[in-house]
Amino acid sequence: MKKEKKTPTPLPSHHVLFAEPGFFLCNFFFVLLKHTQINPFFYFLFILLFIIYIAIIYFVFIRISHFSFSLCRQCNSLGRMIFMCAYLPAASSRSVANPALPPQKKKKKKKKGTLRTGEVEEQAKGNISFDLCGKQNFQ
């Protein structure tokens, strides 16, 4: 018996088709027509989803790529372009705008309720009074 050589099955191309806007629009309006015959509320829902879809495309491909066009020219693939345009400029500007601060010195806490002997005598005479915040008022 001869062993038959198995040819590798090609990958399904549906994931490529879903990435095309024309194919998405065909599916979108087909599902819209199908479901609006069942329930008219779906018409409003699908139009809302379509507006959100257009807004996402606008912000990802136009706004983000416009602000970092120099990064986009260096990319090969679309996914890498989106990653570089969306994350790297924000990360680099964040690190430049807020550099690591040097460690701050801890302030010594003052003990409340203890006065030096000279201050006690002056307070007894009425020369020094304390307001509600604990600040000294000289009269």
UniProtKB/Swiss-Prot annotation:
Membrane association type: Multi-pass membrane protein
Localization terms from the record: Membrane
TM spans (from-to): 13-33, 42-62
Keyword Transmembrane appears in the UniProt entry: yes
Major localisation: membrane
Disordered as annotated region, ranges: 94-121
Keyword entries, A-Z: Membrane, Transmembrane, Transmembrane helix
Start-end of Basic residues biased regions: 104-114
Claim: Hydrolase is one of the keywords in the record: no
SS bond list: none
GO cellular component, one term: membrane
UniProt signal peptide: none
Function summary: May be involved in telomere capping.
Name of the protein this chain belongs to: Maintenance of telomere capping protein 7
Gene this protein is translated from: MTC7
